[in-house]
Amino acid sequence: FLFSKKKNMHLAISGNIGSGKTTLTKKLSEHYKWIANYEDVENNPYLNDFYKDMQRWSFNLQVYFLNSRFRQVIDIKNSNKTHIQDRTIYEDAHIFAPNLHTMGLMSSRDFNNYQEIFNLMDEFVKGPDLLIYLRASVSTLVEQIQKRGREYENSIRLDYLTRLNERYEAWISEYSKGKLLIIDVDDINFSENEEDLGNIIEKIDAEINGLF
């Protein structure tokens, strides 16, 4: 490990709903002794309502996530330790909010308002040192979502996941905020298979050691 060059790195894991971000964040934080910053799903006051009525609650939910993620990024920036973040502020702004707008689930004035808030925040935000993208097919996502059995996710539609996946691929293809590591998760099981996790860790080591 050549961590001595930079003690306070910022790594982030991106990917669609059910791609395994939270699981990998936990495993990597345990392995490297990094601080994990999770997505705020437990305390989020809008999530249940959003999945019942997306149109009504889309703006509220997205602003909540944006605020929560911005706070995380500021905390990471001011920290002298290495952090690994479960999803980035860019996914909120470039994938989830535009998708809701395109699907007619967020009005244009709300979307424009949202974009203005993000653009302001973006001036204070730097991309992570390394972004790890978990690429998964829709069938893998559905399988994972069903396996973890979060009640509010039962109503997620296939076309919603498909559109998100398309937006993820478009975003990743143009990503330029820092180093990028893409991991195809369809044929691996890092949550239960130590060898699969070990392979991911090797790739991350190579990226980190080449960073500085």
Which sequence ranges carry the predicted segments?
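P-loop (Walker A) phosphate-binding loop of NTP-binding proteins
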Residues: 16
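Conserved lysine of the Walker
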Residues: 21
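Post-Walker A alpha-helix
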Residues: 24-25
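Conserved substrate/cofactor phosphate-moiety recognition/catalytic segment
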Residues: 30-68
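A glycine- and Lys/Arg-enriched "phosphate-lid" helix/loop adjacent to the NTP-binding pocket
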Residues: 95-169
